[in-house]
Amino acid sequence: VGKRFSIDRKRFYMTGHSGGARVAMQVALSTNQIAGVIASSAGYPDATPRASVPFVVFGTAGTEDFNHLEMRLLDRALTSPHRLAVFEGGHTLPPADVALAAVEWLELQAMKSGARPIDAALVDRLWQKREHAIESVATRSGTLPLLQAAVEDFTGLRDVAPATARATALGKDKAVIEALAHQQRVDAEEARTIDRMRTLEAGLQEPSKRRESLGDLEGILTRLSRSANAPADSLERQSARRILRTVTMGAAERTQDKDYLQMLAKYRLGR
């Protein structure tokens, strides 16, 4: 590509969705020529979180995406410049506004790193857009991460002192602290449930454990289905839907147990 087109060699970016995102990340990890990756609904090729990478990362995930938890864990572990945007939806490409936000974020990172000159007018325009997005959030717990992200993204490009002070104050709010802790508890329970179901699936292969494992799996699936079909949206409903999509996806590759596969088909969610 670099030979065929006139491209700024300091600004090679890659992107991909799901498996394509893993390929993009793998290429970026294997060379020092990639400035950044937009990773849609999947992260590293081995799905293992890293503390840092030599390129910037903008990740996206739907609230009911079966790779949602993976992307959240990537976000929590990574300390080098990155951002995660979550949108309402499943395992799909991000909506247009999120895709545009990803490109805008890459421009900010390029200015911060010196890969492109600082454009004060663009910085101000993107800051105003970010302020509008922050003010449109209905909850304080939802506002805090956006404020923190704005401070990180615009530090060195403009004055962020007022946003920093507001984020600091919100970070001490007891209701906000509890809401964020609740999110982490839901995430932890999601990971435990998936691990438990994988263990029970393995038990289906052992005659002495099969009956008990099948019964336990049905109990978990019944509980998840009840939460997944709750009328009101909640972190628990989103988590249940993600788990159901995770365990029903590729089930025939993990087990040949016909009774279990029929059970999963009964609980499979629509797109």
Predicted regions and their residues:
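Alpha-helical linker/edge segments of TPR/alpha-solenoid repeat scaffolds
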Residues: 112, 167-195
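Short beta-strand/loop motif that positions the catalytic acidic residue
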Residues: 58-61
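Short glycine-enriched nucleophile-adjacent loop
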Residues: 21-32, 37
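Gly/Ser-rich "nucleophile elbow"/oxyanion-hole loop immediately N-terminal to the catalytic nucleophile
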Residues: 1-18
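Short solvent-exposed coil/turn linkers within tandem alpha-helical repeat scaffolds
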Residues: 89-93, 150-166, 170, 207-215, ...
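C-terminal catalytic histidine-bearing segment of alpha/beta-hydrolase fold enzymes
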Residues: 72-75, 79-144, 148-149, 161-171
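Acidic catalytic loop of the alpha/beta-hydrolase fold
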Residues: 63-69, 92
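A conserved short beta-strand
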Residues: 32-45, 55-56
